[in-house]
Design a protein with these regions (language model features):
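Calmodulin-binding IQ motif helices
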Residues: 249
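Extended, highly charged
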Residues: 1-216, 220-246
């Protein structure tokens, strides 16, 4: 409730100068939790693989249910940016493994990641994407939380843990990710490329979501901590609680 109240206050229109002045203490307090960019390499870049060496075969990606279309990355924090504004988004969109360097990118048309994809398509350029895995659980929660448009998910994560998230620049693109996450899968989506059939997938509803066509994500780098732990979730029929798997690499 406190988070919701703060976000509503921060995003509320302030027509008068007096309204803006009254908002200063709130905004000053929130500034303590804004993400910070740091120079150099982060813990998530202690081991770096690029090019042909950046193989997803190094990850224990799971097939969760018998009729799933394949193996899926199920706890990806997908980092994208709007090409016009530079505003960041972090969302959670499952990723079906097609080969060692290619996955699907399952963002529905109403998700911010899909809107960023459409903007990159209009620009005629490839879309940089970086997928973070693991790290502070606040990151995973923030990636799934219902947030107002243009509100930074890493700000919410900073508020929840009472300290700002430190971000580092990726190795092969200009996306910034949490310095202390476990893995980062760097790559791109080419909006000019034909979409691929993704699914089925045993989903939260207790039913399989059907096959559909989604963009392809191509891997350019795989970085990780030396003591990385791979996170995954297996969703199922309510009221089952989603299972969380932590696999040490």
């Amino acid at each position: 409730a406190r988070v919701d109240g703060l976000l509503r206050q921060a995003m509320a229109p302030r027509p008068s100068f007096a309204d803006k002045l009254r908002a200063l203490p709130l905004l000053a307090g929130m500034s303590r939790w804004f993400p910070r960019t740091v120079s150099g390499r982060g813990e998530c870049q202690q081991v770096v693989r690029t090019g042909a060496e950046a193989s997803l075969a190094a990850l224990p990606i799971l097939k969760c249910w018998p009729a799933d279309g394949g193996r899926f990355v199920t706890l990806p924090m997908v980092n994208t940016v709007d090409p016009q504004t530079g505003v960041r988004n972090v969302g959670m969109y499952r990723m079906q493994l097609f080969d060692d360097r290619t996955t699907g990118m399952h963002w529905h048309i109403h998700k911010t990641g899909a809107r960023h994809y459409d903007a990159w398509k209009r620009s005629g350029r490839r879309m940089p994407v970086s997928v973070a895995l693991g790290g502070d659980p606040a990151y995973t929660y923030a990636a799934t939380a219902p947030m107002p448009d243009n509100m930074d998910e890493y700000l919410l994560a900073g508020f929840l843990r009472r300290r700002p998230v430190k971000l580092v620049k990726c190795v092969t693109n200009d996306i910034y990710v949490p310095a202390d996450c476990d893995f980062v899968i760097e790559g791109y989506v080419d909006p000019a490329e034909e979409k691929a059939v993704e699914g089925p997938f045993g989903d939260h509803t207790g039913f399989y979501s059907l096959e559909d066509r989604y963009p392809l994500f191509h891997v350019t780098a795989l970085t990780r901590r030396r003591d990385a732990v791979y996170p995954a979730t297996v969703v199922g029929i309510p009221p089952q609680e989603d299972a969380l798997s932590l696999i040490h690499i």
